[in-house]
UniProtKB/Swiss-Prot annotation:
Lineage: superkingdom: Bacteria
Phylogenetic placement of the source organism: Bacteria, Pseudomonadati, Pseudomonadota, Betaproteobacteria, Burkholderiales
Protein name (Swiss-Prot/TrEMBL): ATP synthase subunit delta
Keyword vocabulary terms for this entry: ATP synthesis, Cell inner membrane, Cell membrane, CF(1), Hydrogen ion transport, Ion transport, Membrane, Transport
Functional note: F(1)F(0) ATP synthase produces ATP from ADP in the presence of a proton or sodium gradient. F-type ATPases consist of two structural domains, F(1) containing the extramembraneous catalytic core and F(0) containing the membrane proton channel, linked together by a central stalk and a peripheral stalk. During catalysis, ATP synthesis in the catalytic domain of F(1) is coupled via a rotary mechanism of the central stalk subunits to proton translocation. This protein is part of the stalk that links CF(0) to CF(1). It either transmits conformational changes from CF(0) to CF(1) or is implicated in proton conduction.
Species per Swiss-Prot/TrEMBL record: Bordetella petrii (strain ATCC BAA-461 / DSM 12804 / CCUG 43448)
Record carries keyword Ion transport: yes
Pfam families given in the database record: OSCP
Length: 179
């Protein structure tokens, strides 16, 4: 995976640079890149894009035809570049890096919150306020429920994980007793 990230990085940085200078703005570009990544991540599309019988022009037309949003010329050029360099299937990785660059630029981060139970809006707000103080960033929450946690929450912000779930506490206790 590290190799894919390394190959995708220059494309994500170039795309971010173009998006930052565009009047449509970073959020519009992030949505569009997310859609492109979703199309590129489809198994049928991946299979078609690796078909040796298709030329570059056919791949470009096929791929752009599957995208619902009208593509600006800069994005069409980007897709042509990816196809010419056999990098179109890296779009999901490029999109992830683009969002990371966008978040860093905006001073924000995605907070993946996993809870054992459904959290109310007030609970999410209170948790995010505490986490924003801890991480020093404006956080965008994404909440999922995983009953296997038994209780508590697990929060991932970037590469940092804060796990206060009962499941994690039991695992630590088990490891301590086994040692």
């Amino acid at each position: 995976m590290a190799e894919l990230s390394t190959v995708a990085r220059p494309y994500a940085e170039a795309l971010f640079s173009a998006a930052r200078d565009d009047k449509a703005g970073l959020p519009a570009w992030a949505d569009l890149i997310g859609e492109l990544a979703q199309v590129a991540g489809n198994p049928d599309v991946r299979e078609a894009m690796t078909d040796p019988r298709l030329g570059d022009a056919q791949r470009i037309e096929l791929f752009t035809g599957l995208v619902k949003t009208q593509l600006p010329q800069a994005v069409r050029n980007f897709i042509e570049l990816l196809v010419a360099n056999d990098r179109l299937l890296l779009l999901p990785v490029i999109a992830k890096q683009f969002v990371a660059l966008k978040n860093r630029h905006e001073g924000t981060a995605q907070a993946e919150i996993t809870s054992a139970f459904e959290l109310s809006d007030a609970q999410v707000k209170e948790l995010i306020e505490a986490l924003e103080t801890k991480f020093g960033l404006k956080l965008k929450p994404s909440v999922t429920v995983d009953k296997s946690l038994i209780g508590g929450v697990r929060v991932a912000v970037g590469d940092q994980v804060l796990d206060t779930s009962v499941q994690a506490q039991l695992a630590r206790l088990r490891d301590t007793l086994a040692a």
